Amino acid sequence: MSESPGKLRLGALVALVVGSMIGGGIFSLPQNMAASADVGAVLIGWAITAVGMLTLAFVFQTLANRKPDLDGGVYAYAKAGFGDYMGFSSAWGYWISAWLGNVGYFVLLFSTLGYFFPIFGEGNTVAAVIGASVLLWAVHFLVLRGIKEAAFINLVTTVAKVVPLLLFVLIAVFAFKLDIFTADIWGLKNPDLGSVMDQVRNMMLVTVWVFIGIEGASIFSARAEKRSDVGKATVIGFITVLLFLVLVNVLSLGIMTQPELAKLQNPSMAAVLEHVVGHWGAVLISVGLIISLLGALLSWVLLCAEIMFAAAKDHTMPEFLRKENANHVPVNALWLTNVMVQVFLIITLFSASTYLSLIYLATSMILVPYLWSAAYALLLAVRGETYENALAERKKDLIIGGIALVYAVWLIYAGGLKYLLLSALLYAPGVILFAKAKHELGKPVFTNVEKLIFAMVVVGALVAAYGLYDGFLTL
């Protein structure tokens, strides 16, 4: 594309969305869901998630179309609607969520390789960390070659990893047994699951994790060949991934019972297929997961760097994060991101951090950026901004924005106090970069309202720090 160097077409944007969302989560979905919910609650939970996440997808589509001048997605929307500190917090939270997720992906990737090579163990052995480090820096230098080139490789890996998922769904359809599916719909035989409402709430963080990446196209809005493709890519990607997730989860519950699924090791999809067709099924899914994780890692390294770069371009992050190399890659943002991943990979050697604990924390960090995006879409509709002579569209977007905002608040509630406090602990140190950016502009760090918000973050962070010290909070 010599006439538009480095620009991303619709297919590449859809692949970024699908590639970001289909990472490791879907391959562990049968066990992750069965651990907290039975059939009835799973169906209710997916219904809530489908409506909530679809409204979020529409939010990102609407904002991409109505505010095409805002680059950087979740960061830009929070800043435009609610000020500099909220914009910074969205960028900071999204960035931490993304690289924490990458650490989790590396752990899961080498845990899966441990199926073939026992030296990698559960993904946190010395050999696994060395292997993960080599792969991390290989991806790093690949991305340095250019966004377009990396996006093309992501397109290839996205296509490659969808094939084993399609095979799983086709085989599972024929292996599905209605009597297994309906054996204990509400989980009454397993009191540990709690009430149906408890089951639904407990599965929410997992459903959010498997959908993180829905905003991927909006993050790259400035690099899209057509701005209108950003919204299309978001909705196409969402519907594709939703179908896969629901089919994988629901069909598994008709092959093995909830207690059986809950006891499986991850990637549990491999064990489900092995139950149906034998050993080759587990090998197929394991290979699919490895390809999937490699693609997801690439997507998330791109997203990490881009969100910091977008915020720095707008003077909300410090100037040094604006630097691009000759291939138009935000080089300093990329280095900062991958150094943090490397540090936490080493930490996994000395801590009890597992894939799931990393994923829950990463999920909790992204809830605030989602909340502000939904709130901004609702704010535009309430004010009527960009809706001149479009009353019907304004009413529609009022409803969509309202549902998306309620859903975002529900997710924070479902995540629980523990992850709210741990999020505050990770949000608080970001003020150092925010203050540096403000100092470079010669402006005061906070407005009066922002001082109050930051004070609340600090209180939450102090409670979390004490909780970790005292032992009533754990990572």
Regions of interest found by a model, annotated:
Residues 324-325, 370-459:
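C-terminal membrane-solvent junction of multi-pass transporters and transport-like membrane proteins
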Residues 3-6, 43, 120-127, 159-286, ...:
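Helix-loop-helix junctions that connect adjacent transmembrane segments
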Residues 12, 47-48, 116-148, 165-169, ...:
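Transmembrane alpha-helical segments of multi-pass small-molecule transport proteins
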Residues 5, 9-10, 129-133, 225-227, ...:
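Loop-to-transmembrane helix boundary motifs in multi-pass membrane proteins
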Residues 1-31, 35-36, 40-43, 53-61, ...:
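Membrane-interface "cap" regions at the ends of multi-pass membrane proteins
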Residues 113, 127-180, 234-238, 363-368, ...:
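Membrane-interface loop-to-helix entry segments
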Residues 75-78, 83, 115-120, 190, ...:
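TM-loop-TM module centered on a large, flexible mid-protein loop between adjacent transmembrane helices
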Residues 34-35, 45, 54-144, 149, ...:
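Hydrophobic transmembrane alpha-helices that form the core helical bundles
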